[in-house]
Amino acid sequence: MSGLSESAKLVKDALERRGLETPMQPNLATPAEKKEKIEQHMREILNLLGLDLTDDSLEETPQRIAKMYVDEIFSGLDYANFPKITVIENKMKVSEMVKVKDITLTSTCEHHLVTIDGTAAVAYIPRGKIIGLSKINRIVRFFAQRPQVQERMTQQILVALQTLLESDDVAVTIDATHYCVKSRGVMDATSVTTTTALGGIFKSNPATRAEFLHGLR
């Protein structure tokens, strides 16, 4: 962890202490080594499925998938990619709720490795610190860019912001369509899953909780 930013270390440690970290094992492979191995194995999988990898439409597919996994949709497994966070002193004495909603979220179901597609809303009550608004979106994206279950992802975003803001007063909700439900199994194309994680005053004060949740309608 020596190469990680202080923010990344704090968030990772907080999630591990709470048992909320994504199940991972130590991996010292470089990104290039990971891509090489994934490409090899993906080539084997596609061959087993009977696809002709000499066809010009398919010949680069194993390489494309390897690059996509490491650099894009699973990049959140590597805390070296944790966003640079700007947290500043609340000199303006802002004390009312700050809420960002309709944050676009695309993740991957860890059970079937298919898409989770939805939106997130995040709110916090400023105390001693405030955070740059775009950083909230970037934190959501970081935790979305890994194999996930929605319940855990919601909690991870909550704990990350609580840790960085040094305040429990954070709320997170996610509405998402799961393609493991939509494109296979029950084949339900219209259902949406909602998960919510509340901390501090959002959990203890019904009026604050209602202000957050009702403002999402």
UniProtKB/Swiss-Prot annotation:
Biological pathway: Cofactor biosynthesis; 7,8-dihydroneopterin triphosphate biosynthesis; 7,8-dihydroneopterin triphosphate from GTP: step 1/1
SUPFAM superfamilies in the record: Tetrahydrobiopterin biosynthesis enzymes-like
Complex and partners: Toroid-shaped homodecamer, composed of two pentamers of five dimers.
PROSITE patterns: GTP_CYCLOHYDROL_1_1, GTP_CYCLOHYDROL_1_2
Residues engaged in binding Zn(2+): 109, 112, 180
GO cellular component, one term: cytoplasm
Species for this entry: Vibrio cholerae serotype O1 (strain ATCC 39315 / El Tor Inaba N16961)
Family: Belongs to the GTP cyclohydrolase I family.
Keywords from the UniProt entry: GTP-binding, Hydrolase, Metal-binding, Nucleotide-binding, One-carbon metabolism, Zinc
InterPro entries, per database record: GTP-CH-I_C/QueF, GTP-CH-I_N, GTP_CycHdrlase_I, GTP_CycHdrlase_I_CS, GTP_CycHdrlase_I_dom
Principal EC category: hydrolase
Enzyme Commission code(s) on record: 3.5.4.16
Swiss-Prot/TrEMBL catalytic activity: GTP + H2O = 7,8-dihydroneopterin 3'-triphosphate + formate + H(+)
Name of the protein described by the UniProt record: GTP cyclohydrolase 1
GO MF annotation list: GTP binding; GTP cyclohydrolase I activity; zinc ion binding
